[in-house]
Design a protein with these regions (language model features):
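Short, low-complexity N-terminal intrinsically disordered segments enriched in polar/charged residues
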Residues: 19-43
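Sec-dependent bacterial lipoprotein signal peptides
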Residues: 1-21
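Exposed beta-sheet edge and beta->alpha loop/turn motif
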Residues: 88-140
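Short, structurally constrained coil/turn elements
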Residues: 15-17, 70-75, 123
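Short solvent-exposed beta->alpha transition segments
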Residues: 31, 46-93, 107
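Sec/Tat-exported extracytoplasmic proteins
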Residues: 38-45, 53-57, 61, 101-103, ...
Length: 140
């Protein structure tokens, strides 16, 4: 094989390996972010959950004090991922999650479906939520 062809082949191989590593890292961080978010929601840590929301989403859809106070009335009793899909070459993910919430003031449990849209932020090297916190006023 000609030395130039050999160098080009090695370069192409190196680029493919680096792209694969990058993709695997994004996949791994997606799983970690989803697990962290699920844990925070299961413990009804609504303020911590808000830290997962993308700043640009918050600018357009700020969380009101009323929204946070309403969420604080509820304790999560169940969090079940019903479907998940990845788009845009692994940079966007959507999850449909069934969340059961118990309101101690009313002694009532309700079930909501939370449609989550996540996008990988390459600058921050983390997954951010682009769909807001669960809405306890939605009925299943």
């Amino acid at each position: 094989m000609h030395p130039l062809k050999k160098i080009i082949s090695l370069f192409v191989l190196a680029v493919l390996v680096l792209a694969s590593c990058s993709s695997n890292q994004v996949d791994k961080s997606r799983g970690e972010a989803f697990k962290q978010y699920e844990t925070i929601i299961r413990w009804s840590q609504w303020d911590a959950a808000a830290d997962f929301i993308a700043p640009e989403y918050l600018e357009e859809h700020p969380i009101s004090r009323l929204d946070m106070d309403r969420l604080r009335l509820f304790k999560v009793t169940s969090y079940t991922v019903r479907s998940a899909a990845v788009f845009d070459e692994g940079m966007t993910a959507r999850q449909e999650v069934e969340i059961k919430l118990f309101n101690a003031n009313q002694a009532v449990e309700r079930t909501i479906i939370d449609q989550q849209e996540w996008r990988y932020n390459e600058e921050a090297k983390r997954w951010l939520l682009h769909s807001g916190l669960p809405d306890p006023t939605k009925r299943y």
